[in-house]
């Protein structure tokens, strides 16, 4: 964490002559050490957009019970990932690349549940006398549990800075952009590494949600389904056939009814096939991609004797994704 802070400070100091527009990448964050696992879980399950219990006291009590039941298991997961989440260092690397490619703006990031928090980042941008901000959701599809939670946090942090009133614009979803979907398709083809696509069942795995949240009006499921349909159209245009192309939901928690089918269920259903997974709701690798998809489900695939099991990386700090982000920000300026 100290190394990341040092690099972040250096990066921000180098921008001191600074562009007057800043782009803040918003994401959920992840533990920067095993010590932060408890902080991460506590903040997540105290979020009313995640745990939608209206009574504040009850939400905190239920949240505490969930944290206590999960903390040791979560620590073991992060131990397998080197003692921390990869999300923060990869996001930092992405902002470095963005600042190299586009010195006309200052790119930074804020996390929802672990440092650097939006309040910390915005205080720094106020000192830099930034005149305009772009809050950029790192979630391709919109959900109240992710996008809205991050925006709400960022705007509340901004309101607390009484003398800092920059112009603010937002990018809240980008899944329908053809350039993004071409990058995703190229990532899938790269993971196939000249294997025949028609031999594989392609599963687009996204983070699951309790069905009650979708029933209350959250558009996440609809947008994920639309995203898959757009990718199918692009595959047809480029004549890239798969045995099947499917959408699944991962990371179910608790006894509630969640969106279906689950990723586990589809992997088991296609046990006699070659399977390739693309993490469609994530832009940066995290425990749900590197542990759940690439370790936990891989072991399951081996037990099921699946012929071949591949997991695609997220877009991460790739130059293609960085250029895509810059393009979205440029288009926002011209609108």
Swiss-Prot record:
GO BP annotations listed: heme biosynthetic process
Reactions listed under catalytic activity: heme b + 2 H(+) = protoporphyrin IX + Fe(2+)
Binding positions (Fe cation): 207, 288
Database matches in InterPro entries: Ferrochelatase, Ferrochelatase_AS, Ferrochelatase_C, Ferrochelatase_N
Keywords linked to the UniProt accession: Cytoplasm, Heme biosynthesis, Iron, Lyase, Metal-binding, Porphyrin biosynthesis
Protein's cellular compartments: Cytoplasm
Name the record gives this protein: Ferrochelatase
Species of origin: Helicobacter pylori (strain G27)
